[in-house]
Amino acid sequence: MTTTATPPQAIQVSVLRWAPPIVHGLVRDLRVRWALEEAGWPYRENVVSPADQASAKYRELQPFGQVPAMECDGLKLFESGAIVHHIAERSPALMPEEPAARSQVTAWMFGALNSIEPPVMMFNVLDMIYQGPKGEEYNGIRTWVAAWVESRLDVLAGVLEGQEYVLGRFTAADVLLATVLRILRDTDFVRKRAALAAYQQRCEARPAFQKALRDHLANFAAHAPKN
């Protein structure tokens, strides 16, 4: 597919009405917002409540009742990776023109979601969300998952040595990789790897990311529960 700079006419992104502060900056609508900002595509929010998520109408858009989902000129899409890929396929800001280079971007997008995010999410659940007993069995599992995370990040750090982004220039792969790394923000996994720390800072310093994050957080602030 040849990329085009012409944006669709009507884009709506479904986002959570509110979420606890522990996940602010992590909910996956941030990826979609960032990709849209990089592409220069204007969009409007469809703010959904828990009741909306459970409704038959919303399940037609997102079968699992999650966010994000996107409606784009009549097309309905769900899953953040699929949405970012759809945007990238149509935006030269996120995807190069040359076929082999495009394939490499796609490979790294899948790598972010299939090879790196699963152990990262598992560690996050164990370390920050799980509230059950934390005895010898828990510690053994946590140690094993931490080693899994370390091994994946060692590979990524090696790839990033000496270059700004995973494929040289910024692409949609970096949108997914950087948002996966954000999940580890309360750990030292990224901080202790200079190449990864610099990479994440570089990605998050981009104006498009900053705008996406501001809008993501502003939505939660606007709908925060009243005390």
What is each PLM-predicted segment?
Residues 1-143:
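GST-like domain detector, emphasizing the conserved glutathione-binding G-site
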Residues 49, 172, 216-217:
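Short, solvent-exposed turn/loop segments enriched in Gly/Ser/Thr/Pro and often Arg
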Residues 51, 199, 218-219:
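Positions that flank functional sites
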Residues 2-4, 112-205:
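GST-like fold's C-terminal all-alpha helical module
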